[in-house]
Amino acid sequence: MGHIFEGVGVALATPFTHNEVDFDALRRHVKYLLDNNAKSIVVNGTTAENPTLTDEEKDQILEVVVNVVDGRVPVIAGTGTNNTQKSIQASVRAREIGADAIMLITPYYNKTNQRGLIAHFTTIADAVKLPVVLYNVPSRTNMTIDAETVETLSENEYIVALKDATNDFDYLEDLKQRLNLDEFALYSGNDDNIVDYFNQGGHGVISVVANVIPNAFQSLYDAKQNDENIQSQFQPIQTLLDALAVDVNPIPVKALTAVEGFGNYEVRLPLVTLEDSDRQKLEQAYEQFKVGGNS
């Protein structure tokens, strides 16, 4: 089947105005991403505030994104939950709306074991028959997909990629030894480790800060493919990432999408917006990044 994309996929933030999804801002944002070298758009994931979106909102957001993208890049829908049947239902709706692939997080709260993960993911994949990106983010789920389990899952024709947010490079090396990387893609789920991830053979990143600087990330990936040393090129991005670490994702990046006019910096409870002083510091860091010609 090959890789869904290579380079930068954007973990799309959801713009809100007065606590409602701002679909006009969403359309502008997606057009901006397409114009600035995004290679894939990932909808309704962690950065989208998935837990506080209704099923209807998720479907509407996906439909808008699919329509704006119009086949130019793959659209990946975050449809995974800790309920296998609900995940199937959401994934089938995503397929009908026009998603090119689905992303499935490991079950959370009602944690399972590795055999349960295999059964969960393969049941969804076989029911939906779309390319699947597994999402391993133990910091949020307290559950990990062992490398051996990923190897087993990769035997399923639909399970073709992993978003790896472990920040564990021993895990990455284990995966590389077990998988056919011509057919199975490894995407970083951590913006701040992409130099090492790219240097060690990763196929791309599903990025938060690429909501505002997709071209910078894609340029970094392209430079690595040309065997360039990308550490110095990454340094301005790292400085911006340090500023973004002021609070949990997606609170800070919403302040930056607001700067670009894609909604405002609203988030839904239980998330709360940045303190004014923190927001101002972050906006200053972003302005310095842009003044440096890095975007």
From Swiss-Prot:
InterPro entries: Aldolase_TIM, DapA, DapA-like, Schiff_base-form_aldolases_AS
EC nos: 4.3.3.7
One GO cellular component term: cytosol
Gene Ontology molecular function, alphabetical: 4-hydroxy-tetrahydrodipicolinate synthase activity
Ligand binding (pyruvate): T47, I206
Active site per database record: Y135, K163
Domain of life of the source: Bacteria
Catalytic reaction equation(s): L-aspartate 4-semialdehyde + pyruvate = (2S,4S)-4-hydroxy-2,3,4,5-tetrahydrodipicolinate + H2O + H(+)
Chain coiled-coil ranges: none
Amino-acid biosynthesis recorded as keyword: yes
Location of this chain's protein in the cell: Cytoplasm
Pfam families with a match to the protein in the record: DHDPS
Keywords linked to the UniProt accession: Amino-acid biosynthesis, Cytoplasm, Diaminopimelate biosynthesis, Lyase, Lysine biosynthesis, Schiff base
Pathway(s) where this gene product acts: Amino-acid biosynthesis; L-lysine biosynthesis via DAP pathway; (S)-tetrahydrodipicolinate from L-aspartate: step 3/4
Family: Belongs to the DapA family.
Role description: Catalyzes the condensation of (S)-aspartate-beta-semialdehyde [(S)-ASA] and pyruvate to 4-hydroxy-tetrahydrodipicolinate (HTPA).
Protein name: 4-hydroxy-tetrahydrodipicolinate synthase
Organism: Staphylococcus saprophyticus subsp. saprophyticus (strain ATCC 15305 / DSM 20229 / NCIMB 8711 / NCTC 7292 / S-41)
Native organism taxonomy: Bacteria, Bacillati, Bacillota, Bacilli, Bacillales
Designated gene of the protein: dapA
